[in-house]
Amino acid sequence: MNLNYTSPVPQMPTQRSTSFFIEDILLHKPKPLREVFPSPFSNSIASRMPLLEYGYPLMPTPILAPHPHHPLHKPEHHPYFFTSGMQMPALFQHHPELPGKHCRRRKARTVFSDSQLSGLEKRFEIQRYLSTPERVELATALSLSETQVKTWFQNRRMKHKKQLRKTQDDQKTPNDVDRSLENTSESEMHEKNTDGKNGMSPDRYTLDDNEDDVDIEDDICSPEHLL
């Protein structure tokens, strides 16, 4: 009788080693889904939707709704991410120091009435250069701003010089042209010297020769002097 008895060694189930082959990756099956039974307090469709193993619903959430968090992870609030109750990112939040409406500044063309143009022309015939107090006085009388009066006189003087040049170019005698230029320069210098003696400084600026109209750089958000 043979007493050499060896008990059979139980065979352990062989586990397939994890591999990165495409066949092994495709063989992995997703975890089974469990169905959530309807709650007595809710009859919505979302409550009967299948959930993943950790409780995330397979239902698309709104874009601006807060993202569901795992119970083990607390939601972190970051100023650049969407937060609960906000419809816009915190990056574009309103700053109290900034005005609600931003007024865009642009060049607005001023339209003068006939009475205003008549008053400006009459004053220009008498005096081509105005001091600051004279501009304020004329602007108040014509219901205009000081800037409008100043700009109109600037453009009007430039237009007057163009007219003189055109008249001088049409003349046939070169000596007459030179004589007219000298008279115009002497007249302007005399007016500037007279204003300087009275403590008034004439306006000095550079204008475009092609600009005959009046352009006022003003704030279009304020209804002041809109004609």
From Swiss-Prot:
Q: Name one GO cellular component term.
A: nucleus
Q: Which Pfam families match?
A: Homeodomain
Q: Which UniProt keywords apply?
A: Activator, DNA-binding, Homeobox, Nucleus, Transcription, Transcription regulation
Where is there biased composition of kind Acidic residues? 208-221
Q: One MF term from GO for this chain?
A: RNA polymerase II cis-regulatory region sequence-specific DNA binding
Q: Tell me, which GO biological process terms does this entry list?
A: brain development; cell differentiation; pineal gland development; regulation of transcription by RNA polymerase II; stem cell population maintenance
Q: Which residues bind DNA?
A: 103-163
Record localization: Nucleus
Q: What does this protein do?
A: DNA binding protein that function as transcriptional activator. May play a role in the determination and function of cell types in the brain.
List the PANTHER family.
BRAIN-SPECIFIC HOMEOBOX (PTHR24333:SF16), HOMEO BOX HB9 LIKE A-RELATED (PTHR24333)
* Similarity comment: Belongs to the distal-less homeobox family.
Q: What name is this protein filed under?
A: Brain-specific homeobox protein homolog
Native organism:
Danio rerio
Q: Which gene encodes it?
A: bsx
